[in-house]
């Protein structure tokens, strides 16, 4: 991870007016720490590089590493910060809760199976 120390921290946000129900954020080689907070959106985070400490109102702090996927329901207080003196990279997908609930309702109305598919070996 030494190579991450020499690279400047960057942040990118993405939104498209054609899809107002989705927003993404990407942080590369970040060291910024944030206080515990919540979002009005359903959020999915992917750790690309480095290590972090994830804490939420669901339980104790957990060390998470590259390759970890974190799911945070709307309005759940949480924090996710790099390990001390380390940088990390991650991506966040924020989905509007009203849009997600509408999508879920439409699936139910159409009788679509909303269960997670299982491997049928």
Q: What do these predicted regions represent?
A:
Residues 11-114:
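N-terminal regulatory/effector-sensing and dimerization cores
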Residues 114-121:
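Short, intrinsically disordered, charge-balanced linker/junction segments flanking boundaries
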Residues 1-14:
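Short, extreme N-terminal leader segments that mark the start of a protein/domain
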